[in-house]
Amino acid sequence: MPVSQSWWQVEVHCDPLLEDLLYWRLSEAGGRGFVCESKAQGLQVHSYFPAELWEETIRDRLLQEINADAADLGLPTPSLSWQTLDEEDWSESWKRHWQPQELGDRFLIQPAWLEPEPSDRLLLQLDPGTAFGTGAHPTTQLCLEGLETVPVADKVIADVGCGSGILAIGALLLGAKQVYAVDTDPLAVGATQANAALNDLEGDRFWTAIGSADQLQPLHAQGVRFDGFLCNILAHIIQALTPTLSELASPGSWAIFSGLLTSQADTVSVTLEEYGWVIRDRASQGDWCRLVADFRPER
């Protein structure tokens, strides 16, 4: 494959206080995966864009947005640079930057290409490929921590916007009976399937499909009862999917919502409550927020 048809590595140097907003801007622009390193001069963030998404208009808009964010916070102007990578270089670049990571009280996120060290934690092996979700992003961390607070064992769970599959696999490692994972990005679904195989979780317990929550409706019509939902997606998508999720839920179902900024949490909460969800926990990391909600339509 020609270099021009593969990947762009985008590198941003910025003040550490800009980290959370920068993750959000890169996600919205189409970035796949994030690597963050602390440097003496500040923060260095790498993200990876498919070649077709790194157009001049996207570059210009992203630069304007992050410069405006820095100005609003009174921070130095970030620097933005990029270079092309072929598939092999992309993979090797990713692997150089990513190391094992303990998350929550129970998980150890393990790069699949490294030999795991002995640990009493739940080993979650991962090769994210081009999909979002390594455990490095605050919203992924918040969701995994949230999973430790809800009933998972022997439950049926849906992961809407599964990315690399990290949350779906986490649920299975915690003893979920079945997990149904969907994503509108075919590359993400492929990564989820591959990561399930890495963790020996193929079979009847794990189901994937390309699409969104609408892919779960036929299953619900056939009698599948969803006990929990994982939604690490952007705020406006959570709001748009709330009616469908409410149709799929049963009284007592729970949901974990992240991918939203703390400044968006109140607006998202209002939408959820209009459709019968009760927010029982709210946590944040930097500018990012997680909501845990229970479905109680007959309050």
From Swiss-Prot:
Coiled coil: none annotated. It is found in: Cytoplasm. Keywords: Cytoplasm, Methyltransferase, S-adenosyl-L-methionine, Transferase. It is an enzyme of class 2 (transferase). Its EC number is 2.1.1.-. GO terms for cellular component: cytoplasm. Methylates ribosomal protein L11. This is Ribosomal protein L11 methyltransferase. The lineage of its organism: Bacteria, Bacillati, Cyanobacteriota, Cyanophyceae, Synechococcales.
